[in-house]
Amino acid sequence: MNLINYTKRYFESKILIFLFLAIYLLFGIFIFKDYGISFDENINRFNGFVSLKYVFEKLGVNIDLSLFVNNLPNLSDYADRAYGVVFDLPMAALEVILNLTDPQEVYLFKHLVNFLVFFLSSICFYFLLNHLFKNNIISLIGLLFLISSPRIFAESFYNPKDIILMSSFIFAIFFNIKFLQEKSNKYIILGSLFSALTTDIRVIGIYLPVLTLFFLFFDGDNKGIKTKFIKSFKYLISFAIFFILFWPWMWDGNIYKLIISFKEFKNYPWEGEVLYFGNFLKAKFLPWHYFFVWFFITTPIIFFLIIILGLFRSFSIFIQNLINIEKINHNNLWKNKNEMILIFILFIFLIPVASIIIFNSTLYSGWRQLYFLYPPLIILGLY
């Protein structure tokens, strides 16, 4: 009887999740036409066509792109060549394939695809939460945190950079955690693939594979150092292949271009001003607390409180382990596999925030450049 009841509850919970996701998908498809064009969309579209022109030239494809966009420069001469086009390039190709020449059709199509990418990442986020917590209710709550945040929900339709980055980051976190736990070739490929895609969208994403390999080596399991070197080598080779493959600007193998992209991200050369606490401030001279304030005022208060409590608890566990490191097996920073993943997620959040504060990176339009940190914050809040 217990087995029957368990099986019944299991299928009921799966049906509930399926219905919830189906309703969410239909709702998004129903309202995607209600959103206008955001500031960056036209720029990103142009970026995609510049790279598409370069790809066509390399492949010997003769298609007149002036039917879609005029005055396309060569990629080598383009001012924004250092920005990844993982999303923009396929979207430009789809415009050509579908022969979308009407501007309204173009941007409505982009909004629909933008939402669908976020929807797929939402499904992945649910599976990630269920993998970590083994609880359908907690996983559903975490999913609600993600998709019902007003700013995230709205921008999931018209933000082709930050939302796409966050979506790719969710997949990358999931598969890198699976790689750390199982260390199989399948997850080497999937983890390196989505890490490369994330890095190709914004170069800051490169810290995730570095962090993953750091945790691989410092995990005091029964795997020998030779095995870990082999796994790391496979991961790095796969990452390098995917990284170059999905970023046409990198096809010539010039590693210096990666440094150029880093410099662009570290201090984006935008001379605009930002209204902050009643004063107009240069975006490149914003105070260190800019991100934290914007996160607070744009996140539902109950979400914010849960995330802060989880962040405090996670940081406390890490500090306690650091103090008592000599008492832990193999001198690890974690006592068990669950704590390893918790501290891994904590560092996923801490590293980019610390980098932005230290390098005084240019921020504007709220905290959208750091949206990719929202999913790991939700995970920390639920722990």
What positions do the PLM features span?
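Transmembrane signal-anchor helices characteristic of membrane glycosylation enzymes that use polyprenol
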Residues: S13-E41, F49-L59, I63, L67-N74, ...
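Transmembrane-helix signature of polytopic, membrane-embedded enzymes
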Residues: F18, I123-S148, Q181, N185-K186, ...
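Transmembrane-helix signature of polytopic, lipid-linked glycan biosynthesis machinery
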Residues: G28-K33, I152-F153, F157, L197-T199, ...
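Short acidic/glycine- and proline-prone juxtamembrane loop motifs at membrane-interface regions
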Residues: S38, R151, F157-I164
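Transmembrane-lumen/periplasm boundary regions of multi-pass, lipid-linked membrane glycan transferases
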Residues: L52-E57, D80-L89, L98-D102, L197-T199, ...
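Transmembrane-helix motifs of polytopic, lipid-linked glycan transferases
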Residues: L108, L112-F133, F171-F175, S316-I319, ...
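Specific aromatic-rich, kink-prone transmembrane helix
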Residues: C124-F127, I164-Q181, L190-S195, F349, ...
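Short helix- or helix-capping micro-motifs
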Residues: G142-I147, F174, S195, T199
